[in-house]
Amino acid sequence: MTRYIFITGGVVSSLGKGLASAALGALLQARGYKVRLRKLDPYLNVDPGTMSPYQHGEVFVTDDGAETDLDLGHYERFTGVSATKADNITTGQIYKTIIEKERRGDYLGATVQVIPHVTNEIKDFILSPAMDETGAKPVDFVLVEIGGTVGDIEGLPFFEAIRQLRQDLPRNQSCYVHLTLLPFIKTAGEMKTKPTQHSVKELRSIGIQPDILLCRCEQEIPVEEKRKIAQFCNVRPSAVIQAMDSSSIYAVPIDYHQEGLDAEVLDVFGMHDAPKPDLSRWEAIDQTVNHPDGEVTIAVVGKYTVLKDAYKSLIEALHHGGLANKVKVNLDWVESETFEGDEGAAAARLENAHAIMVPGGFGERGAEGKIRAAQFARERKVPYFGICFGMQMAVIETLRNVAGIKDASSSEFGPTERPVVGIMTEWIKGNETVQRRANDDLGGTMRLGAYDAVLTPGSKVAQIYGGTAISERHRHRYEVNIGYAHRMEESGLKLTGRSPDGVLPEIVEREDHPWFIGVQYHPELKSRPFAPHPLFASFIAAAKEQGRLV
């Protein structure tokens, strides 16, 4: 029997519902249960694929090609369970489905309304089969996070749907966890419970009585305040769980267990004989985080550095590499535009970095700065890791400054006679521009999800991966033009990874450099704290070695 846990939020956004959901999922896993996490996003966009990184943050891509909320990255990293298209839905998708059904006549002339049609679609999504990763057995728990905060007009159909589900499901098969905020007013020297009381009041006004309150706070909650919250919010004192700020997100499962969150959830379900949790791997990570053997500094040369959430999986993957090497990873965020117009700016800013990371991005803005970062890394022999756009800029840099093709560019930046990088429907064959269409082998213009690649035997990447066959997640419209492969190789930039048909360049590396690798895919999306991605583990190892040399 699958049980359902609904995680809602109140008072303010960005309290960490996704992280709380992931941590609770990890605690249930530690007790031997199978879990799956799902996210309901109330925005009207069909998916976040076209949303600005400054508004939405990272777009997390699943193996089956879904563009989803960054919280699914937390789910995967904490539980190790790969998410799918069936684990994220938006209001836009729901309305799109309903309108298509109405146009087909599926509703037989009925008036289409929020209740029951929208709420039924939401309930159908939540109750859709949730299988373990083998696909053979249903999971024990489905954790469902509702985006936004209680009181948001966009979220009302979702709250109504989960209200109905408590009545639809058998007794003791659902649990409401409400994440809220207990602000500490420094001038008054006291913690305020009123925002939490009002948040729960709003939740109860729409028919939902939370079973557990997870209270974000900067300081410990006094016992009398817990009793006060319990009394006014109609929960047991033991169900008021303290969620203090933590120095590391990977300490959160341990903290929540010590506060009794998982035990309280199991009590709601009447599961009093649940196995004790094995938190040894979380404790090992916490030990490494708090007692590293050293530090490395990675310069991250990006376009969206104002909002760090735009690089959420990348940040975590770099820290996973640090865990693998038992070092603390310090990130120096560099806006790539600062390198444009000043040739010495890159050298001055990157001088103290042990390694350089150039992540993905879209558009011409900041591209020249990323090219200069790649040039600095190549010339100074500093470890360089280029992902997606970062690989493409490394290729352009080599062809401009080593091969002598001074006008090498990308068709993403506008018309060019030297499209070293082109959209996947544009390729140069001889003197002709070849147009590929959606029904050709390469498909459309956006490559999403997991694709296989073949590595060159004996290459650095083959050694790092420990084999020549890999599968990685992609999200891009532009590719390095295979027609320039020979010039790249002549310039020392070896093409050591391709699609199985040999057409699409996937990986480049320099043989005359201690660690210079560019990849077209996004390896950060598959990194886990317990299984750091091999490229990130190797990259941080190279940075650690660089630190010994300088």
UniProtKB/Swiss-Prot annotation:
InterPro entries: Class_I_gatase-like, CTP_synthase, CTP_synthase_N, GATASE, GATase1_CTP_Synthase, P-loop_NTPase. The active site is at C388, H522, E524. UTP binds at S13, K192, T193, K194, P195, T196, Q197, K228. CTP binds at S13, D152, I153, E154, K192, T193, K194, P195, T196, Q197, K228. Residues 1-271 are annotated as: Amidoligase domain. Its EC number is 6.3.4.2. Mg(2+) binds at D71, E145. Residues 297-549 form the Glutamine amidotransferase type-1 domain. Pfam families: CTP_synth_N, GATase. It catalyses: UTP + L-glutamine + ATP + H2O = CTP + L-glutamate + ADP + phosphate + 2 H(+); L-glutamine + H2O = L-glutamate + NH4(+); UTP + NH4(+) + ATP = CTP + ADP + phosphate + 2 H(+). GO terms for cellular component: cytosol. It comes from the Bacteria. The keyword Flavoprotein does not apply. ATP binds at S14, L15, G16, K17, G18, L19, D71. The keyword Chloroplast does not apply. Catalyzes the ATP-dependent amination of UTP to CTP with either L-glutamine or ammonia as the source of nitrogen. Regulates intracellular CTP levels through interactions with the four ribonucleotide triphosphates. CTPSs have evolved a hybrid strategy for distinguishing between UTP and CTP. The overlapping regions of the product feedback inhibitory and substrate sites recognize a common feature in both compounds, the triphosphate moiety. To differentiate isosteric substrate and product pyrimidine rings, an additional pocket far from the expected kinase/ligase catalytic site, specifically recognizes the cytosine and ribose portions of the product inhibitor. This is CTP synthase. It comes from Caulobacter sp. (strain K31). The lineage of its organism: Bacteria, Pseudomonadati, Pseudomonadota, Alphaproteobacteria, Caulobacterales.
